[in-house]
Amino acid sequence: MKNITIETNRFLLKVLTVDIIGERYLDWLNGSNKSEYINYSIQERTIEEVRDYVASRENDNSILFLGIFVRKSGEHIGNIKYEPIDFLNKYAIMGILIGDMEWRGKGVATEVIQSSSMWLHNE
């Protein structure tokens, strides 16, 4: 899915693209604070592997993979992904990663899940 921007009070949700993937993002997956609940981060990943993973999802209409960006600063703090999306039955599996530790516990998930799920419901 291309050219999607969903606005919330504090965040912009934009389609995740390979140009966003850098060392900071890689640290979220490989670092000591990684989530044990993110299947993709079970093993150490290289920047190339992560970019390939993101690229493989960029043009797939059954996947909505969004970066979470702070509106005021543009800082990328995490991701939310719906995969696969069943538009006919209005069903999707959702996963979220708040990679920036400073933003954990501050209601990010609530805000972005509400806005992105409403957007998806209306699509």
Q: What are the language-model segments listed below?
A:
Residues 105-119:
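Conserved acetyl-CoA-binding loop-helix of GNAT-fold acetyltransferases
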Residues 1-51:
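A short, well-structured alpha-helix characteristic of acyl/acetyltransferase catalytic modules
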Residues 45-102:
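Acetyl-CoA-dependent GNAT
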Residues 123:
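Long, contiguous binding/interaction regions
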Residues 15-26, 30, 70-73, 96-109:
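Short, charged helix-to-loop "capping" segments that act as catalytic/coupling loops
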